Amino acid sequence: MTLQAPSAHDRNLPGLASLNLPPMFISEHCLRTLFYHGPLSPVELAAHWRVPQDVAVEVIESMKGAGLVEPDAGQTTFERHARVRMTAAGQAQVAQARQRTWYAGAMPVSARAFAEGVAAIALAPPDAATLRAALGELSIDETQADELGQAASASDVVLVTGAAPDEQAAVAQAVGGALPGETSLPFAIFAAGAVLRLFDPQRHLLAASDAAHDDALDVMRQHRDTASPWIAVRRPVVTLAGGVRASDVTPAYDEDARFYLAPPPLSALGGLLAVFDADADPAQLAELARLWLLPGKQGTGVVLVRSGERIEVPWRATTLLFAADGEAIGAAGAAAPYRVDIAALTPAALRGVLSTRLGALTPGEDLIEHLAGALADAGADTRVAAARAARYLLDLAAYQGVGGGLDAAVGRAVAYAEGASQRPPAGARRPRRA
């Protein structure tokens, strides 16, 4: 469901009161907008801020009374709808306003409006058929697919073990791609005296209703014909490669523009957050759990700003933690009620994985059967082992060319898959393969 702001509570309030923002911030936001764009009318300001026109009119009238703006030359006969420009007093105040932040896009929403708005959004569960089909292409059976789908329907945390490193992204995209519909988020929120920008054009794909606008991605300067500072987006899929870093759990501060940028977990609001190799840094993973995953059980996330202030925001997102095993993620395991192990492969699934991975070599059935049988005999019929064995043969073919020597290399590929190379002849030295 696409949300329209202001919230139900605020729609009953007149004019500026509907924004539930400090008057000083609204005044300075107007001055910053005029600084960037030059003279604008209340109608143009309302379109730029994505607020009702009566709000923009009230702001301008208030600022006229304070001597901060005046009608632009040749516009005095238009009374309340004239374009206005900053006076000398306004020019002096905008310099101070830009010391606090340079943000001059859509009007930020208050923390309360953000909470009420997110609560009003109904998220549809993933489509079971779509999810089964997408994961089936990765030789993940329906039971495991349904377990992932069940967790996603509750926006819960899942520990996924046994995935090969190079297929973690494919699993995440399969789950994220099965999340139907769209969600909404404000361009920015104002809390703790600071602006936090939520919309990120690199992470958020516009829904059809907003994508029709050519200026949709210009979050600093866009003009719109809607009275809502919320934007409709497809349900986001946000991924973190190489585990969690300290910068992934707290908002980044733009020193030049002087506002905060939403951290990846908050960008994933209403969608999917996936952490690849989550066990790479257990300490930072524990911090993700402390600020987002554990509070997320109550539908809350924690944003820490530079002042040390703690801002609690509404948060819910399906989270996939990919790790080698459940013990490797340490204390963060308490945040993951769902655990799906996709390591083991049936004989048919093993052949399917090998056939897909070796597709560039157009391998014959004999090679696939030979390799699958050798892996099974070695007790290495897992996703990671299959990926390593296939990688070995692909590397060999790239080096020596695709000839008749691949069958002879199966034994070495299996040894490599098990994490050990064949023992070199006595007295010989050979480099270790990473």
Language-model features and meaning:
Residues 359-434:
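C-terminal alpha-helical "lid" subdomain
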Residues 36-48:
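Short acidic, hydrophobic short linear motifs in intrinsically disordered regions
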Residues 283-289, 315, 328-361:
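Conserved AAA+ ATPase core "coupling" helix
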